[in-house]
Regions:
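Sec-dependent N-terminal signal peptides
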Residues: 3-13
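Short beta-strand elements that form the blades of beta-propeller/WD-repeat-like
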Residues: 82-89, 138-147
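Bacterial signal peptide processing site
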Residues: 15-17
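Structural signature of eukaryotic scaffold interfaces centered on beta-propeller domains
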Residues: 66-85, 125-137
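N-terminal accessory alpha/beta regions
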Residues: 26-81, 90
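Short aromatic loop motif centered on NTY/YTY
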Residues: 122-136, 144-147, 154, 165
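Short N-terminal edge-element motif at the start of the domain
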Residues: 85, 94-134
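Beta-propeller blade signature
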Residues: 99-106, 154-163
Length: 165
């Protein structure tokens, strides 16, 4: 009986990881299309599919090797493994505009939020390319490059409250 339960859990886990793998392949195709075609519909499809993928709890530990290849996509994780930041270039071209999503665990659930300049005040705008997360007592500091006018290093702080990030 115990063997059957373990087998069912293993098969279920493999199917879930396979689902994320399939979504990653679709994201990879859309990423290339949005940068080659410069068409808004590809950007919108990519963003929508990325949010679907990130809202799946299995994505929290998935490595996304195909998307990270050739610097298309950057993923950083906090030392306590509670928070991940996904950044990618949204426009292509010489000026670098990045979009970032934060994914974190709260009470056993996966929460996904789009970051903007200075985190929430300009939600939905373009961000830095984040490369490091530093932990404090009740905060995470995100370090990234802001590349519109220069390669300035930017630090955004996320405060952790009991009910929200």
């Amino acid at each position: 009986m115990r063997t059957i339960i373990l087998l069912i859990l293993l098969v279920s886990s493999c199917q879930n990881e396979q689902k994320i793998s399939i979504l990653e392949k679709e994201l990879n195709i859309l990423f290339d299309a949005k940068n080659n075609e410069r068409d808004e519909k590809y950007k919108e499809r990519f963003d929508s599919l990325l949010q679907v993928c990130l809202n799946d709890s299995n994505s929290f530990t998935y490595p996304f090797h195909d998307l990270k290849r050739n610097g298309k996509f950057n993923i950083i994780q906090s030392p306590d493994k509670i928070l991940r930041v996904y950044s990618y270039e949204d426009f292509g071209g010489t000026m670098k505009f990045y979009k970032s999503y934060i994914q974190y665990k709260r009470n056993g659930k996966i929460i996904v939020e789009q970051l903007g300049d200075s985190i929430y005040p300009f939600k939905g705008r373009y961000t830095s390319l984040y490369y490091q997360i530093e932990m404090g007592k009740n905060e995470y500091k995100l370090y990234g490059y802001w590349q519109i006018s220069s390669n300035e290093i930017e630090c955004d702080t996320i405060i952790i409250n009991e009910n929200e990030l």
